[in-house]
């Protein structure tokens, strides 16, 4: 696979640790000299003399890790870096946060107000921060958090005003913990919990009694809630039960419509019907907005389509226009509906009305949450919504002042375009809608944020969208390659992982490969492998996948090797146990080794300690993709003479024969590479004999019968090499290989497959196999071991070899009694006979000698076949033509060829091909003498 898309970030082990420096007391400005600007001292800037407030402002623009790095430069800046004003908020999500780390940070967290964390280990460690003044706590991946942990957190932080856990389900939290929240946090204003099984009346009534300021309440994706008790939380202004099941809507509408302050109600993704919706919109005196997005029961009923009969109330649903509904909240007809979010943001800058700000923030939050949840489950029938409204809503919400809304919207964009995660398939229409509305530029701006959470989600969206070639081009034109290459250098694993995914998808395009290398992307990707070699499979798979794509380019492959990529990829192939990483590492090594003589990467991979052994082991993987790429790598590496023998020593013959035997029902890609690797190894006579001895002939014959052109072509090549050995030739006959090769020779759409099948048959019946059969005691007319008639097989083979050769000759040439040998005629014959791909075949001296000897064979068909083969191997322009000509000249074959061309006993086909062969030799001789 050459690219990857991701729907949702998953919690992984091995998070990088927070860099913590010793705590120093805050310093004060003692005199005015400390406020002077940096001065030039001997040509250098004295950065220490920067005003303290300027340095503090600089610190605020950096993430925690960069703050720590900057603070390590000198004692003065260490003191400033520890200032409590820099530690009012803390995002622990990208880091491994445990009790010891919390204790190290505690002295800085006296004034900590806002905290975001991820996972149960971080939750258990929060109390060790001793941040008694915490106002807001937000956690995700909380499925393992228990009542005890949550109760302990709220008991130590009585000043909490906001608590959010989700969007994943809090499976182990019960109503007992909710009661603890109510008892311990009397100042609570906002509570949003996801995925709780049962929210009892006692828990809700405790909130109503002990949290008089609670105005924003959300029980999302819960199984059961007490509808009547919710009607007693009279302080609530904004209520969300999105995704919650088993709600009795008759009870809910009879109780919630009496809530005196209820301004916004979110019932998205529930089974609410039109009756309850009408009741809320007509009975509630305070309600302004009812959000009912993706409510299938409501959408199946057309009675509410003309929802504008509810004067002063706004219904947001899939059958309404969300932008129009939001715009109607403010009676300003001068604004275009799609500009409503921008209008709101300007309004929030100028207004001091906290109620309006809270209202707008709540709407942004619930819409972003519902859009993400809807994108994750990707229900059918929403294409029109996504194209006309959904994409634009997500892009608008990405510009929110709320960081979590921005992140969720970017994640929504990354998710809603994906059709199939495994096959890296996206919906082109949705992707184009994002690009049309300026989404690429917005995402790239978000990726440049100093906030690592935004960087990560924006990079993920860019990566998924870049599966589309047009969007990949737009990303490159907007400077996205440089941005992603920069993010790939991040010390935050989540950011680096998503950036590597973006480079992986962008590197599919040939036009982007060099740009990635020039932006430093190759080195960044290699460094990622060394930075997180263990336990970070997502990073490693994406880095290896991107390097695999880049290694397919000759120039970039040299950059990969120069950056240490060979060692890094071999390390992954040897040590990593995750199949996705193994597959991409093997593919990268295969591509590095695929450039032949244009660079020395093939030899370099083979010389890397443990490389060949690792690839041989990977051919035994239970995962088909790993086996396929490992076999492909061994195939490419086998073109190097030393590698070929080293692969054999590493057990490659046995492993690849076993692979070929087991892949009869596998994908064509695996079959092609298994046969190809055996083809490459069988160039060596010793390997050829070993392959035959290990049982490699039957599976290759089976693969030669494949309908897939690529498969039977590589199988024909392997059988051609094996047939050079008379023992293997006899095995091929005994195993029923002659009919398979005859079928290829006559019926394959691949000229190369037909050619190599004909050559294999010629090897088998040029007389050497008969001598071998006599030597081992088998009659020349019958093979007793398999009861196969050699004479019958020979006749069948020669008949089809002749038909194959004649298919490359214009029959009109032989109409006249005397065949012309003019240069024009010979050129015409050459043009018709040439098999372009045959120029890539490289024969040994023994093989060339065998074809020359075959010209002396009494059989006219074999003579013609030998001349035809030598013609193909020496045509000017062929990759190895000069090599073949040199072998023939060194063997002194020219005199014999002239004799054969002039002999009246030579068949006309062979005579013409021999004359062309002589002309080829003369051409190369003249060329080499210049």
Curated annotation (Swiss-Prot):
Sorted UniProt keywords: Nucleus, Repeat
Gene3D superfamilies assigned: Leucine-rich Repeat Variant (1.25.10.10), Ribonuclease Inhibitor (3.80.10.10)
Highest taxon of the lineage: Eukaryota
PANTHER family in UniProt: PROTEIN ARABIDILLO 1
Keyword Nucleotide-binding included in the entry's annotation: no
This protein's encoding gene: FBX5
Subcellular location: Nucleus
Source species: Arabidopsis thaliana
Protein name: Protein ARABIDILLO 1
Keyword Lipoprotein (UniProt): no
GO cellular component, one term: nucleus
SMART domains, sorted: ARM, FBOX, LRR_CC
ARM repeat positions: 172-212, 244-285, 379-418, 428-467, 469-508, 510-552, 554-594, 600-639, 641-683, 685-724, 726-766, 790-831, 835-875
């Amino acid at each position: 696979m050459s690219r990857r898309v991701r729907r949702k970030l998953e919690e992984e082990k091995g998070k990088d640790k927070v860099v913590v420096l010793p705590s120093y007391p805050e310093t004060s400005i003692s005199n005015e000299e400390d406020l002077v600007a940096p001065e030039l001292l001997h040509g250098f800037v004295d950065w220490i003399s920067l005003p303290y407030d300027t340095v503090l402002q600089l610190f605020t623009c950096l993430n925690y890790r960069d703050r720590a790095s900057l603070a390590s430069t000198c004692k003065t800046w260490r003191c400033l870096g520890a200032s409590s004003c820099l530690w009012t908020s803390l995002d622990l999500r990208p880091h491994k946060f445990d009790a010891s780390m919390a204790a190290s940070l505690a002295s800085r967290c006296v004034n900590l107000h806002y905290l975001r964390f991820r996972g149960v280990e971080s939750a258990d460690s929060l109390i060790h921060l001793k941040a008694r003044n915490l106002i807001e706590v937000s956690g995700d991946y909380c499925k393992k958090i228990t009542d005890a942990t949550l109760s302990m957190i709220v008991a130590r932080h009585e000043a909490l005003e906001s608590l959010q856990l989700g969007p994943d389900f809090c499976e182990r939290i019960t109503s007992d913990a909710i009661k603890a929240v109510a008892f311990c946090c009397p100042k609570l204003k906002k509570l949003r919990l996801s995925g709780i099984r049962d929210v009892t009346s006692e828990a809700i009534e405790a909130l109503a009694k002990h949290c008089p300021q609670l105005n924003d309440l959300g029980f999302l994706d819960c199984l059961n809630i007490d509808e009547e008790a919710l009607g007693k939380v009279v302080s609530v202004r904004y209520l969300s039960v999105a995704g919650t099941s088993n709600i009795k809507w008759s009870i809910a509408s009879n109780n919630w419509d009496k809530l005196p302050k209820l301004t916004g109600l979110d019932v998205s993704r529930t089974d609410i019907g039109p009756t309850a919706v009408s009741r809320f919109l007509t009975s509630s005196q305070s309600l302004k907005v009812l959000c009912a997005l993706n409510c299938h029961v409501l959408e199946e009923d057309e009675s509410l389509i003309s929802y504008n009969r509810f004067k002063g109330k706004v219904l947001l649903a899939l059958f309404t226009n969300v932008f129009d509904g939001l715009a109607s909240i403010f009676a300003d007809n001068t604004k275009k509906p799609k500009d409503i979010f921008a209008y709101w943001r300007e309004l929030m800058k100028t207004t001091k009305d906290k109620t309006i700000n809270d209202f707008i923030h709540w709407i942004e939050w619930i819409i972003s949450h519902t859009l993400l949840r809807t994108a994750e489950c990707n229900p059918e029938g929403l294409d029109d919504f996504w194209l006309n409204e959904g994409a634009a809503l997500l892009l608008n919400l990405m510009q929110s002042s709320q960081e979590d809304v921005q992140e969720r919207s970017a994640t929504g964009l990354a998710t809603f375009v994906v059709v199939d995660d495994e096959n890296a398939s996206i919906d082109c229409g949705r992707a184009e809608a994002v690009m049309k509305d300026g989404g690429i530029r917005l995402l790239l701006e978000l990726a440049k944020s100093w906030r690592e959470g935004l960087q990560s989600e924006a990079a993920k969206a860019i990566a998924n969208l870049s599966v589309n070639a047009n969007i990949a081009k737009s990303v490159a034109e907007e400077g996205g390659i440089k941005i992603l290459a920069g993010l790939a250098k991040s010390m935050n694993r989540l950011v680096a992982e998503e950036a590597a995914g973006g480079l992986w998808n962008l590197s599919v395009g040939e036009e982007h490969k060099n740009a990635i290398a020039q932006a430093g992307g190759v080195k960044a990707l290699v460094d990622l492998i060394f930075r997180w070699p263990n336990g970070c499979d997502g990073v490693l798979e994406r880095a290896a996948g991107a390097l695999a794509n880049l290694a397919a380019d000759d120039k970039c492959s040299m950059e990969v090797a120069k950056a240490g990529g060979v060692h890094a990829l071999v390390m992954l192939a040897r040590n990593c146990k995750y199949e996705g990483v193994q597959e991409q590492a093997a593919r990268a090594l295969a591509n590095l080794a695929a450039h032949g003589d244009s660079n020395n990467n093939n030899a370099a991979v083979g010389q890397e300690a443990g490389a060949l052994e690792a690839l041989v082991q990977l051919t035994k993987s239970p995962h088909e993709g790993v086996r396929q790429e490992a076999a492909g790598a061994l195939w490419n590496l086998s073109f190097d003479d030393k590698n070929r023998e080293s692969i054999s020593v590493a057990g490659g013959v046995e492993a690849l024969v076993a692979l070929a035997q087991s892949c009869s029902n596998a994908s064509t890609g695996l079959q092609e590479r298994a046969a190809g690797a055996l083809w490459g190894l069988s160039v060596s006579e010793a390997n050829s004999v070993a392959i035959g001895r290990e049982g490699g002939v039957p599976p290759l014959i089976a693969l030669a019968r494949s309908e897939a052109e690529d498969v039977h072509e590589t199988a024909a090549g392997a059988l051609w090499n094996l047939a050079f050995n008379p023992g293997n030739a006899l095995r091929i006959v005994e195993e029923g290989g002659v009919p398979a090769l005859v079928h290829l020779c006559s019926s394959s759409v691949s000229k190369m497959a037909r050619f190599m099948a004909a050559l294999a048959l010629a090897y088998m019946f040029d007389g050497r196999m008969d001598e071998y059969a006599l030597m081992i005691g088998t009659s020349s007319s019958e093979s007793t071991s398999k009861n196969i008639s050699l004479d019958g097989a020979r006749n069948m083979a020669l008949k089809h070899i002749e038909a194959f050769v004649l298919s490359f000759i214009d029959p009109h040439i032989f109409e006249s009694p005397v065949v012309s040998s003019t240069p024009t005629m010979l050129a015409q014959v050459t043009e018709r006979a040439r098999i372009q791909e045959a120029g890539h075949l490289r024969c040994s001296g023994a093989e060339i000698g065998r074809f020359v000897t075959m010209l002396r064979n009494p059989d006219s068909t074999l003579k013609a076949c030998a001349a035809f083969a030598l013609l193909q191997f020496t045509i000017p322009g062929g990759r190895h033509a000069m090599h073949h000509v040199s072998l023939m000249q060194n063997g002194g074959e020219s005199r014999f060829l002239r004799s054969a061309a002039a002999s009246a006993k030579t068949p006309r086909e062979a005579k013409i091909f021999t004359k062309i062969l002589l002309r080829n030799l003369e051409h190369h001789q003249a060329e080499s003498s210049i």
